[in-house]
């Protein structure tokens, strides 16, 4: 089942989560997310974007950092580590402490979904 980004963002927030889009300019993975689409997602309530990731070039990191600062959204980093067998190393990219604090501040501490 596919969701519109606005629906996904709403569901994340309803569940007490923080909505972060992962590696939006990672061109090595194929399609990227256009900047105007990111702006539309921010209008729908997107909380932040993953900036620091092995598939983002230095120029892309700079572009995304500028973009996020201008829009005052959270900037995260991630190793995207899902286990052995990939180049990704655990904790190779992380989220800056001030951004981590902003992320935690937006998260709802109570469990919203109890299945």
Q: How would you name each of these model-derived features?
A:
Residues 1-2:
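Short, small-residue-biased leader/transition segments that mark boundaries at the very start
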Residues 9-21, 25-115:
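Charged catalytic cores and adjacent phosphate/nucleic-acid-binding surfaces used
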